C-alpha cells in the first residue's frame, strides 16, 4: 500500500471517527498498576468524577489534551495528583488543585490537530514518591517505529464500562510513520487487543522514560487501534516558553 493510499484511508477514518467521538477514558487490555508505578499521572475531574488524564511536567503545570475541555468547564474542574484508588480520599498521598490558567497552541478540533493543553495549577505541587515530574523529549526528537511504550490511566476495561477504581496500563508499540500523521505518534498492540478508548484523552504516552505523546483519539473499535497521540516533541519549545513565563497565581 502506498503512502498516499494510507494517508487517504486515514483521512476517511478520521472523518468517520470524529462523527462519533467523545473524550477518551478507557485503557483496554491493560493490567492493574502498582501504587506509585506512575507517580506523574494526573486525574482531571469534574465534581469528583475523573474525565481525562494528564501528566505533571513541572511543579505548576500538567500536560493534557485540549479536546478534554471541549465539553467540560475548567472553572469547576480540578486536577488530582498522587491518586491511586479513586474511591478513597487517600489524604496522605493525594493533592488536589484548581486550574489557574490554560494554554493551547492552535488546537484544531475538526482535524484533531495540535491536541495539547497545559494546565497551570493554583500552586506548586509538593513532589513526593507519589507525585513526580515526567520528563519531555527535546524539540523535534523522534521515536522510532517498533519502540515499546506504555500508556496508563483510569478507565473501564471495555468500551462503555465503568471507570476503573485503580489505574491500569498497557504496553504498546509505535507504528511506522506511513501509518500515522506527521503531527502524531501512533501506536498499536501487536498480539492482542489493547490501547486507549472513549474518554482517555490527555494521558501520556511514555517511551524510554519520556512523554512522547498525549492521547488524542483512536481509529476503529476500542483496543484495535491505531491510537493517535499528539507528538509532544513538536511543541517542546512552545512548552518551555509557557513554563518559563507562568501567568499570575490566584489573588
Curated annotation (Swiss-Prot):
Disulfide bonds listed in the record: 52-68, 149-207, 180-186, 197-222
Keyword Disulfide bond part of the UniProt annotation: yes
Variant or mutagenesis effect after changing residue 68 to S: Loss of antibiotic activity
Keyword Manganese in annotation: no
Broad class of where this protein is predominantly found: membrane
Family designation: Belongs to the peptidase S1 family. Elastase subfamily.
Post-translational modification: Cleavage of the N-terminal propeptide which is composed of 7 amino acids occurs in two steps. The initial cleavage of 5 amino acids is followed by the cleavage of a dipeptide to produce the mature form.
Gene3D superfamilies named among the record's database cross-references: Trypsin-like serine proteases (2.40.10.10)
Keywords from the UniProt entry: Antibiotic, Antimicrobial, Chemotaxis, Disulfide bond, Glycoprotein, Heparin-binding, Membrane, Serine protease homolog, Signal, Zymogen
Protein name listed in UniProt: Azurocidin
Organism: Homo sapiens
Peptidase S1 domain segment(s): 27-244
Membrane topology: Peripheral membrane protein
Phenotype for residue 52 to S: Loss of antibiotic activity
Cellular component terms (Gene Ontology): azurophil granule; azurophil granule lumen; azurophil granule membrane; extracellular exosome; extracellular region; extracellular space; intracellular membrane-bounded organelle; membrane
Location(s) in or outside the cell: Cytoplasmic granule membrane
Protein origin, superkingdom: Eukaryota
A biological-process GO annotation: macrophage chemotaxis
Region annotation Possesses antibiotic activity: where it falls in the sequence: 46-70
Example GO molecular function: peptidase activity
Residues carrying sugar: 126, 140, 171
Known function: This is a neutrophil granule-derived antibacterial and monocyte- and fibroblast-specific chemotactic glycoprotein. Binds heparin. The cytotoxic action is limited to many species of Gram-negative bacteria; this specificity may be explained by a strong affinity of the very basic N-terminal half for the negatively charged lipopolysaccharides that are unique to the Gram-negative bacterial outer envelope. It may play a role in mediating recruitment of monocytes in the second wave of inflammation.
Signal peptide: 1-19
